[in-house]
Amino acid sequence: MKNYKRLLLLLLPYKKKIIVGTVFLIAASATNLAVPLYIRNLVDIVMVEKNLDHLNNIAIAISLLFLIQLICQTIHNYLFDVTEKRVISDFRIKLFNHLHKMSVSYFVKRRTGDVMSRMTNDVTTIENIVTDLPATMIQQSIRLLGGIIIIIYMNWKLTFMVLILAPALALFARVFGRKLKILSTEIQDKLAVSTTILEENISCYQVVKSFVRDQLESRRFSEAIEDSFISARKRVIISAFFGPSIGFIAFSTSLVLLWYGGREVITGHISPGELIAFILYATIIAGPMGSFARMYTRLQEGLGASKRLFELLDTESEVRSLPNAQIMPKISGGIEFDNTCFHYQENREVIKHVSFSVKPGQTVALVGPSGAGKTTLIRLLHRFYDPTRGEIRVDGIPLKNVELSSYWKQIGIVPQETILFGDSIEMNIKYAKDGATDEEIIAAAKAANAHSFIMECPEQYKTIVGEKGIRLSAGQRQRIAIARAILKNPSILILDEATSALDNESEVLIQEALERLMQNRTSIVIAHRLSTIHNAEKILVMDDGAIVEFGSHSELMKQKGLYHRLYTLKNLELGAKNNKIEIHT
């Protein structure tokens, strides 16, 4: 119930609407309780005495009661339904914003489909228990308590027969509710698996097709759906048995009530109108009893989903700004790694006692075999992760003491795999700087050698690039990414040079753009191009998480160490035509 209380706290900003809606709900429920009393008078006075004036008066009174109930219920429904949609929308936004506070490690450890399932399926599951469940609880409680008070006053013996129903319903709800909660959580978890497979197949569509794995993926998805169906079928079986069982108990009680009440009418202890009114009140009371049982099962299903959602909200980012973090001043570009260590898993360090320094404005190239730790080192500098030991300083300031956003605003990154949003070219470049003018965007595109091909596109800068930029070539996507970095104008540039095969023209254009981008700023590059290594003031050679060599290209070649070996064994491979080397990372 702790999670449900947390859900109800989401209603606090809208308490005025909730209070007004509750008042109208109480009024609607109260008018409903008055109707059987008028029905009793209709039978005992009008039907027996055949009084036409009383008939008209009672008919008008009942009509007015129904009209009042209609108006009050309509206002209540509007206020509560609008509030529910607003609260759920706010909750989705809250979840989305929380995801953006999470560190990279959170997404590395979890599959995309699981996160998406929580944001969609789980939120939908809790939607009806946020306002609808409390409203139903209030409405049915008024009907139940009000009805019991009235029938006790009318006939306590008949009341006792009606109330026998309560323990049986409570027992049913408790037994079946627990099972439904477990199954609901199980279903959500299994749906997350199928959502993950679906997301992977959409994003990796070309890979699936090229390897002709349609049947394999279809089988994976079918098995995941079938698995969730099995759990859903169990829930359906329980629900299918639960509903009719409640109806059977209620019908049996009504049958006994009719039998005993009929005897009371025959013996003259109660009037026919009182029996009819009593049966109507018994129906009103039985409704809440059955409703409470159904509400309990709905609550258990919602709690299963809310558990997964609050698990997400309660997860704290492994990398976050300290409470007293300082705002990063304008960065000059000095970088220091001081005995820095890092591990993804305990007892398995991937960065081992790395120490080096970079002067402002220097270009440093990182080279080494695959798995050497180059990408991890870059992530530590970007502060996607924090070192497990040692320290990283920028301009002499420890990164752990810096407010994250103030640091990230001054860091630019061009990743090896260019990520574009499925929007226009203009939006993708402008993403680097809020309020960038058209002139600034065009200037950045020109500096990245992208303006010419953009102007050849059907809608030029307004051209939609498709999901992840699929409508553009690899070289065009890279130039858009470079333009974005140029527009940001970062103090420190982090560049993971792409290894994808490009035509000679694209290669030359990209190289020119990168050289412009790296001018007059500190640049840390995972290098794959010979020109980048030759232009670097310092080359750091990494192997097994440590820096094993450093110096210029000529100095490292003279040492005849790992760098020399990589070069001569063609793991660093000179491309005579495209002025390119490749390092497998």
Task: Cite the ranges covered by each PLM segment.
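Transmembrane helices of ABC transporter permease
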Residues: 13, 17-27, 60, 65, ...
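ABC-type nucleotide-binding domain
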Residues: 321-322, 328-585
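Helix-loop-helix
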Residues: 49-54, 150-164, 234, 238-307
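Juxtamembrane loop-to-helix connectors within ABC transporter transmembrane domains
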Residues: 2, 11, 80-84, 88, ...
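Membrane-integrated ABC transporters
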Residues: 1-32, 47-59, 76-80, 84-87, ...
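An intracellular "coupling" helix at the cytosolic face of ABC transporter transmembrane type-1 domains
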Residues: 13, 104-105, 121-130, 134, ...
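Conserved catalytic Walker-motif region of ABC-type ATPase nucleotide-binding domains
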Residues: 99, 221, 309, 337-339
